[in-house]
Amino acid sequence: MPKNLSRRAFVGAIPAFAALSACSALSRAGATGSGSADQGGSIVLGVSGPRTGASAEYGQYWQEGFDLALEELNAAGGVDGRKVELKWEDSQSDPKQSVPIAQKFVADAAVIAELGDFSSGASMAASATYQQAGLVQFGFTNSNPDFTKGGDHMWSPSLTQEFYQTRAAQWIAGSYQRISVVYLESDWGKNSFDIFKAAAAEAGLEIAYESPIQPDSEDYRPVLIKARDAGPQAVVHLGYGPDGARIVRQLREIGFTGQFFGGQNTPQFLEAAGSAAEGTIIIENFLIGNDSPAVVDFNKRFKDRFGHDPSTFSAYAYDALNVLIEAVRRGGATREGVFKALSDGGRWKTVQFGEFEFSADRRPGDVTLLPVTVKNGVYVPAEAS
């Protein structure tokens, strides 16, 4: 493993969403302006994210993480006896939807902070609206570095594409010399690939073949055959879980036996990829099998509640809600109070990072990544080969 990369430092998960239950705690619609500021009533946070559409798979992950956090918070008395509620609006992770949702939230005095959107593009389209209104936009899955450049009310506990892709290229270069890369035909995919390509060149990692792919394609074999025939030691996929599962299955079907980097650290990726997932390496910052006490405890509470292991995105949602509620405790239940608490610094307790501080770019400044692999159908820490 490269010297500048920690043993517990790696794996690139990236975000999608399944339909949410109408009776979920996410879809409470009873909040009004009377809950604003420190006036009593419920503490209301807005959620802009996909409940339907192409990114719907991740909605279930968010829902479960939010629901667990809400149930625990409110069972413990909320904040000074005030119940915590989420007001969810379905954006389909579409910038055309996220902007009117932002306008709706800023006009609702009850909403004191916003969580989302899922994709950086959908979040960034709405940032100006939140910034002008002084409403914190907490883009907890937004890895585009430009997201937090939209204003001082844009905050994200998500690590940037530069952070992920640079370290991914460095880690891969420690064991491989020649690779093929496929990446999503999207703003996120192109940006991720540009960063990865530059980092690979600096690390001496040769990209023998590169190609964009469509996220909703069912047959990637025409591209994958070319990727295979370029003679790589590994194929790197920059994308999401559903497309990653199809890619690794089809790679094995066409006879590629080298290393696969990609997919996503979710139960659904394992299910969709089947036996082809074995040996996959993913770059992440949270591992379900992590033996830290905080992760073990979270996993148990989550599984007791939902009957299955959490995904990384459930942990992201759980942490995001708890960080914002801690900001409410520190600064008060107002838009200004949340912003002041985040701006005042200090350490924030999470499942995925342990404790961390926000850096000057309003992102985590002192965390590491962890490479994970699939072994016997289970995610475990990966070692450099």
Give names to the regions the model predicted.
Residues P2-P15, L20-S385:
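Extracytosolic ligand-binding ectodomains
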